[in-house]
Amino acid sequence: MLKFLNKKKNDNKGFSLVELIIVVAILAILVGLLAPQYLKYVEKSRKSADASNLDEMVRAIQVYAADAEETLPEDTYTITINKDDKSGKATTVVTVNSKKDANKEVAERALTEAAPDWAKTKLKSNKWDSGETGENKANATYISAEITVAQDGGTTVKYTPASLATYINKTAKTGK
């Protein structure tokens, strides 16, 4: 009788169906728990990329304004990064709050020196809070930085939407 119990099956070559179902169920539970966290990390990285792209463009303008060899006229410059439009056109725009087109050209030259492909930068995140509440609450379709250049080369930056300013974790004010 003991010999019968000591005999091993030689045809046991794999897992049983029950074992496979249990493993699949455990994997499904893990995916269900981890997927929302993964999506949060992906969105956070998209926002980080957007904030970094805009911040680098702002720094290019600030450095150009503070540089004694270059001349960035006293003015207010706005850099806006929009969502990718369906036509595939450039989505980053520099505007100047004056009637002098020369100021815009100088700002664009400053950006081109720092980042040659700045005009092709696209908004990666679709979840920037527009700051609106109630029925008008929606996600912002752009992020922007308004850079005011003083006569001495000092700069003040205002970020839009407000959630971008807290994401970059600063309200930049630098001087010469």
Q: Predicted regions span which residues?
A:
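Alpha-helix exit/C-cap motif
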Residues: R59-I81
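N-terminal leader/signal peptides at the extreme start of proteins
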Residues: M1-F15
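N-terminal single-pass transmembrane signal-anchor helix
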Residues: N12-Y38
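Short, surface-exposed interaction loops/tails
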Residues: K83-A90, T112-D117, T121-K176
